[in-house]
Amino acid sequence: AVFEYWTHALSYVPSADLRYFLPAMKAHRAEPKRWAAVGSRDETRKLLRRIRKEGALSIRDIEEELIEKAHLWASKKPSKGLLERAFYDGELAISARAGMVKTYELFDRHFQWEKKPTPASERQVTAYLLDRALTAQGLVSLDSICHLDAPSKKAVSELIAARVKRKELVPVAVEGAGKTQHWASPAVLEPLAAPDETLIHILSPFDPLMIQRKRAKLFLDYAHVFEAYLPKEKRV
């Protein structure tokens, strides 16, 4: 089973990992000013009461007066921001998708736990970030582990140093990396048979292999450009 939440982008995450995201949801709830522009907590509670009464809904189920978009990817419906706020706060979960249209359900009702997971501690979240990167990337740097998450760098750096001291990680010199340090687990550095190149498929420009463009350039010598983020005149 998987759930959706933000990692390097909105991603599918194993449901078994949910406990590592509960602290981030709590932190979102503790910063009301972050969402002041999309509406008040009272408006969010009103929307949550509607979902509790009527069941899961999408933005298409909400009829309201339209407003001017704040930016190109915004919605003309004010409730879209409220849905997103409640999602990042851990009050709603994405229970279904039809392309870009998300259906939201009450968080606890969606997961239907007998017992809600215990939130991970700060140390556990740090270890999760490092272990997840090692599993996905094999060879990691501080930037690749903490992509778009600079506040975690200090704790992750300290954990890396501790694991190097215990010989659970080893420093790796990468040609062309300059001063950027890399690490790997010893097992990853054992010689393996060359992979079948036909088995390598990159399905999305949001794939972590490509979205970290400096890393892609370093390892693949490929300067990736995601043209959806470029003005028309700069596209190829």
Show which residues each predicted segment covers.
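Long, charged, low-complexity, helical-prone intrinsically disordered regions
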Residues: 1-236
